[in-house]
Regions:
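Conserved pre-ATP/AMP-binding loop-to-beta segment of ANL
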Residues: 21-24, 156-175, 181-182, 205-211
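Short hydrophobic alpha-helices that are characteristic scaffold elements of the AMP-binding
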Residues: 80-85, 107, 220
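ANL superfamily adenylate-forming
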Residues: 30-32, 36, 120-167
């Protein structure tokens, strides 16, 4: 039995946002102990605005965008925003160095990076510093003008794009650790993510009222399930 059919992550996300907008979607505690609790409805609004931001930056269906972020709500917004747009998320561990970042960006041909302040400095937008070359770096987590949150909130809450991904389209490319060889990019489709999520939910007997605690890094495939 095909339990995914032609559905995509975008389809699943929109259905959840429509049917349970007031349910808690995410509870996040940052390194300073501050806690944010966001509903499906709140995150759905941010996801569309994020997708519109990427579209305005020239990202289109099938394009790769690197996410050099830790475990933050902004990382989740970017992951879903890219899947809604039909683009491909390429998550990078916050501790990954410049050489590996350069290698990954060249291989996936990413021209846009969303980074946090601790990682943004390794990227070179003008060719003057010898850092990792990229067309555009958006810095998240500062709340400052021109940062991710500001640019996101200045976008509308209605989609400005009309292309839809298919279930066979890549949703993310996750790179292996490289412990035995050069890191390999593993292409994960919308169908792969949906099936894995359904299977894990069944295996763990998850119910709608349950809460799932994860300490996995957001760049890890297990986090994205």
């Amino acid at each position: 039995m095909d339990i995914v059919a032609s559905r995509t992550v975008a389809d699943q996300w929109r259905e959840l946002a429509r049917t349970c907008p007031d349910h808690t979607f995410l509870v996040h505690e940052d390194l300073d102990g501050r806690t944010r609790e966001l509903t499906y409805g709140q995150v759905a609004d941010q996801v569309v605005r994020t997708a519109n931001l990427f579209h305005d930056l020239g990202v289109r269906r099938g394009d790769a965008v690197a996410l050099h972020l830790g475990n933050t709500p902004e990382m989740v917004q970017c992951l879903f925003g890219l899947t809604v747009l039909g683009a491909v998320a390429v998550p990078l561990h916050p501790r990954v160095g410049a050489q590996e970042c350069r290698d990954v960006l060249e291989r996936v041909r990413a021209s846009v990076v969303v980074a946090e302040p601790a990682t943004a400095g390794m990227y070179d937008r003008g060719g003057a510093t010898g850092g990792v070359r990229v067309d555009r770096v958006v810095v998240a987590g500062t709340g400052e003008p021109g940062g991710f949150e500001d640019l996101r909130d200045r976008r509308g809450a209605e989609p400005v794009f009309d292309e839809e991904p298919t279930s066979d389209d890549p949703a993310t490319i996750v790179f292996t650790s490289g412990s035995t060889a050069r890191p390999k990019g593993v292409v994960v489709t919308h169908a792969n993510l949906l099936f894995s999520g359904i299977f894990v939910g069944w295996q763990a007997s998850l119910r709608p009222e349950d809460r799932l605690l994860t300490t996995m890094p957001a760049c890890h495939v297990n986090f994205q399930l």
